[in-house]
């Protein structure tokens, strides 16, 4: 919005030309989202407390979590608000990639909101019925994937980028839709599963979004894309603004979500942020990179799959409790230790993922 306005005002004052620089807009996008999140935090927490929108804690969970019962949840609303406002202010409104991310972000946020509402108002720990949750998540993911396929069919936008191989980028055809679907829905659920401890999900999300900001900048730059042997996608550059907005909003939320948390993001935040990371990876053609950089989310999800599968097949559990962060809690690790160590692992994985762009 402001970019469009600046383009019309630059003829009156050349200083408005600064709005055309991607690096400038990336920085102010981050700061805008950060300040909005920090400003909304105390007000959102007070309002949620007034409405008695408190966290519902499972009785079969770790005993240390019982003290979290009643902590305001649905704080993801302030994350999404900060991201959307910042992106609308600083990104080019004509960029289709930006709108794809916003559709998934807001759409998954609405699904998460309904899920949270059922939990906090009806005191139902299960929330929205699983089949309906997956149905609407699938509708959004398939809708966006199909639209992207129609527009980008037989172009670099539908190629599969394989790490470590510079010339292996096959056309996916209709498999593009299937891959995009699983990445978007899978990442949404993976971040949701990870969001079980104070600040555990938001910091890896910030790290991954920051990594994708660098990838988006390189993908949208013809020279760097050629240098790194990745597809050049002319719309990808504006995803930098989206990624930095996620970073800013996430850091602002962490101010209130750090241990001991004053507010939880709820499904409205975790589903939306996971879906956003998924669609960003799809748009940048970096699904494999997401698996590496988002390794914490992958491990959390695999721990649940293995736990359920093992119990059904053998009648035995692999972990003391799943997702795996609860396993370490029950082993006696203090919650802050689990959180910070997972953060460190996440940062390492993002750096490793970025390094793979050059190792080809």
Swiss-Prot record:
- Which domain of life, per UniProt? Bacteria
Q: Which GO terms describe its molecular function?
A: metal ion binding; phospho-N-acetylmuramoyl-pentapeptide-transferase activity; UDP-N-acetylmuramoyl-L-alanyl-D-glutamyl-meso-2,6-diaminopimelyl-D-alanyl-D-alanine:undecaprenyl-phosphate transferase activity
- Necessary cofactors: Mg(2+)
Q: Per its UniProt entry, what is the enzyme's top EC class, as one word?
A: transferase
Alphabetically sorted, this entry's keywords are: Cell cycle, Cell division, Cell inner membrane, Cell membrane, Cell shape, Cell wall biogenesis/degradation, Magnesium, Membrane, Metal-binding, Peptidoglycan synthesis, Transferase, Transmembrane, Transmembrane helix
Q: Report the locations given in the UniProt record.
A: Cell inner membrane
- Biological process GO terms, please? cell division; cell wall organization; peptidoglycan biosynthetic process; regulation of cell shape
Membrane topology type: Multi-pass membrane protein
Protein's name according to its UniProt entry? Phospho-N-acetylmuramoyl-pentapeptide-transferase
């Amino acid at each position: 919005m402001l970019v469009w306005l600046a383009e019309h005002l630059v003829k009156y004052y050349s200083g408005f030309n600064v709005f055309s620089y991607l690096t400038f807009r990336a920085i102010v996008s981050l700061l805008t989202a950060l300040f909005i999140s920090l400003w909304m935090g105390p007000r959102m927490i007070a309002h949620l407390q007034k409405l008695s929108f408190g966290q519902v804690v499972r009785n079969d969970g770790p005993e240390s979590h019982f003290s979290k019962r009643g902590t305001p949840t649905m704080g993801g609303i302030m994350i999404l608000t900060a991201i959307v406002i910042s992106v609308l202010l600083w990104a080019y409104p004509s960029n289709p990639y930006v709108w794809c991310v916003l559709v998934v972000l807001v759409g998954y946020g609405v699904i998460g909101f309904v899920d949270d509402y059922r939990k906090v108002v009806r005191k139902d720990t299960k929330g929205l019925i699983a089949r309906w949750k997956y149905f609407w998540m699938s509708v959004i993911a398939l809708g966006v994937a199909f639209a992207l396929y129609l527009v980008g069919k037989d172009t670099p936008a539908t190629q599969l980028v394989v790490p470590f191989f510079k010339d292996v980028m096959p056309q996916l055809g209709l498999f593009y839709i299937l891959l995009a679907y699983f990445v978007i829905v899978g990442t949404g659920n993976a971040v949701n599963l990870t969001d079980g401890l104070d600040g555990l999900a938001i910091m890896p999300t910030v790290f991954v979004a920051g990594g994708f900001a660098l990838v988006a900048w390189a993908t949208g730059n013809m020279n760097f894309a050629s240098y790194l042997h990745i597809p050049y996608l002319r719309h990808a550059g504006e995803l930098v603004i989206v990624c930095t907005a996620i970073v800013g909003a996430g850091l602002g939320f962490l101010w209130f979500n750090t241990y001991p948390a004053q507010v939880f993001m709820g499904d409205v935040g975790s589903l939306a942020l996971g879906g956003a990371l998924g669609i960003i990876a799809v748009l940048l053609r970096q699904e494999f990179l997401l698996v590496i950089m988002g390794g914490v989310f992958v491990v959390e999800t695999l721990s649940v799959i293995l736990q359920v599968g093992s119990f059904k097949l053998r009648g035995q559990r692999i972990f003391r409790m799943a997702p795996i962060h609860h396993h370490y809690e029950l082993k006696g690790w203090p919650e802050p230790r689990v959180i910070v160590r997972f953060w460190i692992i996440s940062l390492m994985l993002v750096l490793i993922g970025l390094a793979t762009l050059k190792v080809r």
